[in-house]
Structures are given as C-alpha cells and as structure tokens.
Design a protein with these regions (language model features):
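Glycine-enriched catalytic-core subsegment of oxygenase/oxidase enzymes
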Residues: 8-9, 13-164
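Short, small-residue-biased leader/transition segments that mark boundaries at the very start
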Residues: 1-3
Length: 164
C-alpha cells in the first residue's frame, strides 16, 4: 500500500472508518507480524494488506472491485478497459516542485494532509494489531469510536523531558 493506492481510490483526504486484523497476539511494546489487515472506508471500499506467509503471485490482483481486477503490468479483467480509460478526463495537473509551491503559496501535490492521512492509516493498523481486535474510526474527529484503550494509543504520554 502506498500513497498512489489511496490516490487511485480517491481517498487522499480521508481515513478508513474500520480496521480489522488477523494476527497473533502482539507484544505490548511492539507490533510484530500479521496475516491480514483490512481497512474499510465509509463507502465500503477496502485496502487489504497481506502479511506473514503471503507471497504475491501473478494471479494476485493489485486492485480488485465489483467491475473486475487489475494485475501487475496493468493486465486486467475489466472489459474494454482501455476504451473506458480514454473516455475519462485527464487528472488536474499537480504542483510537484516544492520550492515553487513555497514561493507561490500553491498547494504541493503531496501536501501535509496527504502525509498525515498516510501516517493515520499505518497507525490505525498498529493500534488494531496491538489490541488484536477490530477498531472503528471517525475520520473527522480522528479518534476511535467508543474505544478508550485505542484512543490512549493515539496520544501517548511522552517521556520527560520531552513535550509538545
């Protein structure tokens, strides 16, 4: 999973509402291996991370949805996919020169919110792994829903003399 996966799914500026884990019991101070982590967005879209013992094969789809599957090398099962892609509008141009964005005050392509949402995704998985259970998340408040133990992992006390 990476930034482009969320970009392709149109999920750059939001977070999943649920994270499910299939993993052995974790050490309380570290996250180890997992078999599967499933992130689900409010529209039902999922990102699945396969872990320990999973080996990607040629028949493993990179993206899978109700209309078909896309594999490595853009091989896919979606009928007439190239014609359908040609009908789509070009994406908005992105500002990829960071220094130019600083000078002109324009938004950088991979800005702080996208970076924050990337970190949130990873940290949601880490929290679910440490607690070894499904967690529900509110992408607006950016807190786990009805779960004090999970929320304590979001904002852990810092060791002295460190503070924010």
């Amino acid at each position: 999973m990476c930034i482009r996966d969320r970009y392709l799914l149109g999920k750059d500026r939001t977070s999943p509402v649920k994270v499910e884990v299939d993993a052995p019991e974790q050490h309380p101070d570290a996250v180890g291996i997992w078999r599967k982590i499933v992130y689900t967005y409010d529209d039902g879209c999922q990102i699945v991370l396969e872990g320990e013992g999973f080996e990607s094969k040629d028949d493993t789809p990179y993206i899978e949805g109700p209309l078909g599957k896309v594999y490595k090398g853009f091989r896919c099962t979606i009928p007439d996919v190239m014609e359908k892609l040609a009908e789509l509008p070009d994406p908005e141009p992105q500002n990829t020169d960071f220094l130019e964005c600083v000078r002109t005050r324009r938004r950088f392509a991979l800005d702080e919110e996208i970076g924050h949402r990337s970190c949130t995704l990873v940290n949601m998985g880490a929290c679910a792994l440490r607690l070894n259970r499904t967690l529900h998340f509110d992408p607006v408040s950016q807190l786990f829903v009805g779960d004090d133990a999970a929320n304590r992992l979001v904002d852990q006390p810092m060791r002295r003399p460190w503070q924010i």
